[in-house]
Amino acid sequence: MESGYNISNRKRFAKITGGSMNNSMKKNIRHFFLLAALAAGTIHLVNRFIDMTAEMKNILKTESGSYYHWKNGSIFYTKRGSGSPLLLIHELNPISSSYEWCRLVKKLEKHYTVYTIDLLGCGRSDKPYLTYTNYLYVQLLTDFIHDVIGERPDVVTTGNSISFAVLAQNMNPNLLASITAINPPAMSSFDRTPDKYSSVKKTLLELPILGTFLYNVRTHESNIQRTLQKTYFSRPQLVSSKMLDAYYEASHMGKSHGKYLMASIEGHYTDNAIGHAVKKLTIPLYIIESRSMKDAVTIADSYAHKNATVETAYISNAGLT
């Protein structure tokens, strides 16, 4: 049998080693949380630095326009020229803003009363923490036309913004006079619905520190430049440094809260099927596609096949805008 002395020593050894292991584990846990706090603090400082430096050039001035105080946030818009109303709507993307139209407005204002708008979550407009849905923009477009323009405008959209223009007209048949869509995507791209994977991406982007950091990586100057050169313009040399600065500034105005719109886009909350609405349109719908865009002819034809009154045109050497 084991002596009492050996048993006592074993218990004492177990107590000592167990205590040292517990102390070591506690120390490791403390180190982990300390490093995590330091990492979070560093990322937060990086995020704040990006926000500050992105707006230093102040390209997107607010003095040139006005604000429409909508129920979900203040909406920046401009009004120029005289004539029948023309509303220009930029692509629904947190890097975009009404700056997208800066080259065209001066020409158009000679013949129209030209309105440009920064969509909610974009540019100089408010960027609230909410889930951005297609119907949200249907409401915004409807209310803006009723409260600000006051009559039926012709509307010009770029990219995915065709969706809520068409759906708004479908819900309010006397809302618009016509829709001109520049490089709209395939109608099938609006058929997506949120799933588990897209919901995870949305949740990650909405996180306070990590989500902002991920957003800042996505909207880094080099990534925006790549998007402009490959998607927005057919010739990369047309992307000036001022234009790059404007898109970069737009993406980071409002403490990078454009991430909430990006999160909803990634989560497919801004998508909504439009085929039925295109089919029922009774106002003119003009589709303008760039020949340099992939499947441009197929995309334009799909709209025309859905509604025989749709007119299509193609432009060479042009990108999204």
Where are these regions (language model features)?
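Active-site loop/oxyanion-hole signature of alpha/beta-hydrolase fold enzymes
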Residues: T116-V156
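Conserved HGGG/HGGXW glycine-rich cap/lid loop of the alpha/beta-hydrolase fold
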Residues: T78-R124
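Conserved hydrolase catalytic core segment
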Residues: G150-P194
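Conserved alpha/beta-hydrolase catalytic His-Asp/Glu region
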Residues: V217-A277
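Alpha-helical membrane-targeting segments
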Residues: M187-S234
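Conserved loop-alpha-helix segment in the C-terminal half of the alpha/beta-hydrolase fold
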Residues: K280-A318
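Hydrophobic alpha-helical topogenic segments used for membrane insertion/localization
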Residues: M25-I50
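A short loop-to-beta-strand scaffold at the N-terminal edge of the catalytic core in hydrolase folds
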Residues: Y67-R80
